[in-house]
Every structure is written in structure tokens, then in C-alpha cells.
Amino acid sequence: MKLAVYGKGGIGKSTTSCNISVALAKRGKKVLQIGCDPKHDSTFTLTGFLIPTIIDTLQEKDYHYEDVWPEDVIYKGYGGVDCVEAGGPPAGAGCGGYVVGETVKLLKELNAFDEYDVILFDVLGDVVCGGFAAPLNYADYCMIVTDNGFDALFAANRIAASVREKARTHPLRLAGLIGNRTSKRDLIEKYVEAVPMPVLEVLPLIEDIRVSRVKGKTLFEMAESDPSLNYVCDYYLSIADQILARPEGVVPNDAPDRELFSLLSDFYLNPGKPQVPNPEEELDLMIV
């Protein structure tokens, strides 16, 4: 099974991805997490350090793929999760999406692509150009990380459009939204009313989730010394269980940008505004 995790930049995709990877490993699966971000920090929470990237390794080997061994690019992380960082070109030069393709090509040459029960792609921000949408070519499911805010849901809608486009030619489905660090879910619910899709989980607004990223530890590792965090781990285990059940998923019908902008902005501009009754509904009630 192959998963692709997307979402607005800074929303907590990598923290979420790492914890889902550990949750899948705790369910007995062999997991590989591939970081698809030039910052190459996707797997930091699993390994505790910035591992060398595939591009760094290929450059050292003068792009002789036959000279690269699995141990050169695959690093063991917490919970037995294997970790790879694609890396990227120098800032302002080259195409990061091309690097993702080279990463998959190398892993296939190493016969590593088919050795895992689950491969999870953690993908750069909300960039949905052809290059960074490449992981959707391989994925069975896409998961979108969001919060209860306007910008994150607007980005989620654009990603949903990419899923719909890729699903035309690939067996790809949207598994659902994951709400990260949010005290409310009312705007999320308003969005999924307009664009029907599952909500896998909504994680609570607790500081430990953010702190785990700084510490370079997953919530599961932190819970070993602080059992009060076990309840947070249960959210990730729930997501893992839902994914392993191979849900039907959806091919989303994204909302037009202007329509969504009006829908979400109206939620803020007119909070608690009573719904205008439908004249036909009023007539029906009178007849009854």
C-alpha cells in the first residue's frame, strides 16, 4: 500500500506523517517513509537528525546508480520505520518534482520499492504542480492534513482537485482529511458539507504535538516517558487502522475557487447568521 500526505505548508504534515508511520509499524507493518521536500526534514522526528538525501548520495556517486546500496540511502528510524529523504536541487535552480521521480527510480533499482507493506510519501507543502503531484502517480490513497482555518482548507481544496485529476488515469482515492492541532472543527465540517469527503481524525490543540517536532521525537516515543500522551497516540492508531482496512475512499469534486472563497469567508464574516428559510420548505410545513 502506498500513501501520499499533502497539506498547506507548515500545517504539520511531517509530524503527522511520522506518527502515522509509527502507528502502522505498531500494527505489524513494514513501513518506509519518503520525504519529498527539498528541506529534507520530513523524517527528523523519526531519526532525530537530518539524514543524507538521495540527491546528495547520487551526486557523490556521480549518478552511477549501480554504485548505490540500500544502506547508503535508507536509514532506520524510531519504531523500525525506514526513512528516505529525496532532497532537492539548490534553491532557485532545478525542479524538485524531478527529484521525486529520481528517488522512486533509484528505490526500484535497489528492489526496495516492493519490500514494504506501506510506503508513505510526505510531500512538500500545498504545491500541486506536475512534479510535486508525482507521488499521486504511485499512491493508492491520499490524505490531506488541515486545520480549522481558511487557508488550510483552501489549500486542501486545491489538493483535492489534483487527486480528482490523477484519479482519471490512476487507481487513486482520497482517504480523507486529518485535522491537526485544532480546538474546533466547525469550518472543517462546513467544508465537507460542500465537498463531501471523510474526516479521518481531528487531533486536539495540544502543545506537545508541536514540541515533538522540535525534540525530534514522535508522540509515541514521548509517551514512553509521559504516559499521559498515550491518548494522543490513539488518534494516529485510529488513522492507521482506518487506512489498513482499505477504505473505499472518494474521488472528490472540489469546489470552484471563488465559490469556496465565499463559503469560507462568509463563515467568518457572518458568524451565527441564521439560515434564510427556503420558501418551498415553508410552504410544505404550512400544508402539513
Curated annotation (Swiss-Prot):
CDD domains: Bchl-like (cd02032). [4Fe-4S] cluster binds at C95, C129. GO terms for molecular function: 4 iron, 4 sulfur cluster binding; ATP binding; metal ion binding; oxidoreductase activity, acting on iron-sulfur proteins as donors; oxidoreductase activity, acting on the CH-CH group of donors, iron-sulfur protein as acceptor. It is an enzyme of class 1 (oxidoreductase). Pathway: Porphyrin-containing compound metabolism; chlorophyll biosynthesis (light-independent). Binds 1 [4Fe-4S] cluster per dimer. Keywords: 4Fe-4S, ATP-binding, Chlorophyll biosynthesis, Iron, Iron-sulfur, Magnesium, Metal-binding, Nucleotide-binding, Oxidoreductase, Photosynthesis. It catalyses: chlorophyllide a + oxidized 2[4Fe-4S]-[ferredoxin] + 2 ADP + 2 phosphate = protochlorophyllide a + reduced 2[4Fe-4S]-[ferredoxin] + 2 ATP + 2 H2O. Disulfide bonds: none annotated. Homodimer. Protochlorophyllide reductase is composed of three subunits; ChlL, ChlN and ChlB. NCBIfam families: DPOR_bchL. Component of the dark-operative protochlorophyllide reductase (DPOR) that uses Mg-ATP and reduced ferredoxin to reduce ring D of protochlorophyllide (Pchlide) to form chlorophyllide a (Chlide). This reaction is light-independent. The L component serves as a unique electron donor to the NB-component of the complex, and binds Mg-ATP. Belongs to the NifH/BchL/ChlL family. This is Light-independent protochlorophyllide reductase iron-sulfur ATP-binding protein. It comes from Nostoc sp. (strain PCC 7120 / SAG 25.82 / UTEX 2576).
